[in-house]
Amino acid sequence: MDNRPIGFLDSGVGGLTVVRELKRQLPYESIVYIGDSARAPYGPRPAGQIREYTWQLVKFLLTKDVKMIVIACNTATAVVWEEIKESLDIPVLGVVLPGSSAAIKSSRSGQIGVIGTPMTISSNIYEQKIKRLAPQMNVLSLSCPRFAPIVESNEINSSVAKKIVYESMAPLVDRVDTLVLGCTHYPLLRPIIQNVMGLSVKLIDSGAETVRDVSVLLNYFEINRSREVKDKTEEYYTTASVLGFKEIAEQWLGEEVTVQHVDLDKELEND
């Protein structure tokens, strides 16, 4: 038993899609979440900057005495997950491998689509993981740089969002039977994406798939929390507007949440 919280980090609100799944599958676990919305999206940024920012988020979570870290951001996973995993003595999960495995299991035609940020797509990380596990699969990757900003600005139900998704997804329509949502922001656009791609296309939420691996590792390392839900804690931090984050978080999680603003430079300087 280990009653310490699980730490989640993301470039903004996207990682809440992973938290929602964790709360569904493992409702007794405590959570600390940090979203770097002030510097979102990470996707267009250079790798060195993404690495620096992600390490700041990791260091912040370590000050909260977390027992495990979930990098709930595909871009950060692509750039720095391996390095962080090797550097820490607690389990560190990324979201790419679970999403890749689920896509392989889902696809019948062998035609898999992947959408993500420019950095995730240019890194080729999904294609590499999928091909390593199943060389016969054909992977079609598409960068969708306008999706994460729509989510961060809470415009997911707008006509603009529908137009952008329709225009962006056109190259993949009728070409794949499985589509990996290779950014944790994208499940918030899931209804629109599904409508554009058609009901026959299976959408893979890489973040939700990751929670299954969280459960496996909790058991393996015997660091599950005692199943007393009443004593669990949830802390949510953002580097940007508390109100903006809170609005999206409450819509997505379906409950009231308390959000705190954090200045990472000051927080880590004082640590």
UniProtKB/Swiss-Prot annotation:
InterPro entries: Asp/Glu/hydantoin_racemase (IPR015942), Asp/Glu_race (IPR001920), Asp/Glu_racemase_AS_1 (IPR018187), Asp/Glu_racemase_AS_2 (IPR033134), Glu_race (IPR004391). Its EC number is 5.1.1.3. It holds the Pfam family Asp_Glu_race. GO terms for molecular function: glutamate racemase activity. It is an enzyme of class 5 (isomerase). The keyword Isomerase applies. It catalyses: L-glutamate = D-glutamate. Keywords: Cell shape, Cell wall biogenesis/degradation, Isomerase, Peptidoglycan synthesis. Pathway: Cell wall biogenesis; peptidoglycan biosynthesis. GO terms for biological process: cell wall organization; peptidoglycan biosynthetic process; regulation of cell shape. Gene3D superfamilies: 3.40.50.1860. Provides the (R)-glutamate required for cell wall biosynthesis. HAMAP family: Glu_racemase. This is Glutamate racemase. It comes from Streptococcus thermophilus (strain ATCC BAA-250 / LMG 18311). The lineage of its organism: Bacteria, Bacillati, Bacillota, Bacilli, Lactobacillales.
